[in-house]
């Protein structure tokens, strides 16, 4: 039996008929072929490998008729949606016969018992020669709804065909074939292998692209002229590659341009013809228009992309613009738009119109929804498709005709966009720059895009509504000033928190939700929170205090109001936690204020204490009130160049083990702690160990500083002391600055008061001694006069002469002058103490009114007339009679200039000169009082207007300067918003300047 089979196989493989077993798929791929295929120049491998299908060797001019007859036979769309030829049975039924399909599309005996048929057509051998064959086709297998495998038995009838056919018959056959080719959908080309691929032959159905065969065969157009510019390089590369690899056949897809400029997709299948030398003679191929398939693929792709953007939550504007852009890419030359319906206004507004001329879109935007209101308005109003092939003639376009003409719009097609419930959402509109109506596939294109736009609009609107609702809730949730926490009653972590929690704690929301609740709640509150959670579950609500730990470790005190709520279908505890940091600070501040007031009261009551007791008390209270571990106090010299360390706090002295402690610190060489003097303001350093270019380092065994605060203590504008504290557990802040400043200013005022009282006692004692001395001299004079009046009581030689009496008078005058000097000093001290007391009590009042300054100056000179006369001073005044009035307190101004003139007289020698000059300047009156005294050292000038100033560096020595009243003078000028300054050079006299606003 095996031998018989082998003989049979040998007979078949060597017989005259070549047998193919083909699959009913695109290109008719070959499952097997007999070995005698070598008759046609091929090998079985050429087909079985998939390199060639049976359809590839059919002569191009015969391919369509062979396909159509096959379709007619199997009575089914064999190619279906898989075959690139896109030629279906319905297109050929007129030629192939009016066969009807049965219900399942079966073949065979349902066709009347015939299970095979015969065709005659031409094949191409491998060298490109044409062979006439007779092919018997028999279906061997079937699948449900389509053919499976079929057998093709091919006989070479070329010789018989040539013998049988006479020339006329051959001509008739050729004409018939041409007719079939020219009337089919497959365009046949014959190209020369030259640059540009000139065309030797093209079928007449090239007219489907708008061209004539003569356009190509005449040489006016070469084939590369119609290939889309973006695809030309790829096509050239593909042809070159297949040519170099020695292939005889290849296929490719690309775009070509119709004569109108319209883009078409084609599938080209090409045979490469070579001569005996292997040189390429020509390219023979067919073009199949696959535009419809490509557009369907692109439409599906664009729909998927639009749907992806919808699903990703893109905005409606973005989705509609994407949809319109894809539509315009698929159909170049069409201007696509989407208009959205505003139900309240009953108008259409553009959602996307990227290519529509702005002049037209601006005019149509907001068009009313009604019949005869432009194409889109009519479509929305009627809910039906509106096709306008010629805008210039259609009644629907009367309102927009003129503008459309200006921008070159000639046709318009509008499709209503519906929701799933059938409501009109808008209109998908296409504008053209040519007058025509849409083709069938374009109508489907419009409908599909309108449907997709409806999905997008409805989805986005629904998503927007949901998002808006969620946003309203989230906005309220996140913008409540309190911290909001949601957790399950027995949950160990939080289900949700608001943005305030995120902002205040410094964690991301994800971090907070992944943390245990007790990682956020400080440990000191754990027991209290657990207890309150149990009470909330039992009672439903609870108010209690707790805290939250920030990412940086800071604890925020909270007042928690918690209750049971339903959240997302779950029973949860909703906690409204109010930050009570400010309240806690206020409580602390209140306690501090109480402590500060207590400290200031105690300080005020220490008038009888020693300087050491006062400074020690102030320093230790500064440490206590700021919560510090250490403190110090240093006094400044008169020139603000050197600090003298007065004392350290007890705690600092316990920690410090420096053997040779430094007490005198030049400001220039001081480190970071000297910035309070250099910058003349409080300096807070909450990270003292951090590198700082201003730090000079501290000695071995010095107290280690972590945090530091120091302040300058002012007397007027002059720094008189520096106080500092350090190593507070928390950061220093402005509250600490305020505590330290108030305490140290109180200390300094007490020191001043003690020094003034001491000066008062000293001057009082000196005045008493001067008074006793004066009384003693008076007694001596009385006794002497009595002896002169009663000479009998003494011998002549014992009587004193008048020279002795004159000496007694001189001594008496000296005592009187001394008494007057100390009396005047005492008066000024008392006046100054009184002014300081009134200033401290806030009882110095000013009464501002229009005042004649020349009258004030006249009164001031009158008050000093006796002093001027005693010194026989020459006075010169330059005051304009038309001097402007100023707004001031006449009494205070009189006191001001009386004191300044008194000061000038004091520094002017006997018989010297005193000058007054008053001049008006822009917005001010400038008064200058000059004397011819010896002048004052420049080093003392900056301190003349201080309440006190040092004459040496000892804090215990007396201060001078208040007696002069210049401090009071400056306060009066400041109250009038004026300026006062002093100019002097030793030996050249003094100039006192005052500027007062008009």
From Swiss-Prot:
Post-translational modification: Autophosphorylates: autophosphorylation is dependent on the redox state of heme cofactor and is promoted upon reduction.
Ranges of residues in domain Histidine kinase: 783-998
Cell location: Cytoplasm
Catalysed reaction, written as an equation: ATP + protein L-histidine = ADP + protein N-phospho-L-histidine
Highest taxon of source: Archaea
PROSITE patterns named among the record's database cross-references: HIS_KIN, PAC, PAS
Biological process annotations from GO: phosphorelay signal transduction system
PANTHER family associated with the record: PAC DOMAIN-CONTAINING PROTEIN (PTHR43304:SF1), PHYTOCHROME-LIKE PROTEIN CPH1 (PTHR43304)
Record function comment: Heme-binding sensor kinase component part of a two-component regulatory system involved in methyl sulfide metabolism. Does not act as a phytochrome-like photoreceptor.
Protein name: Methyl sulfide methyltransferase-associated sensor
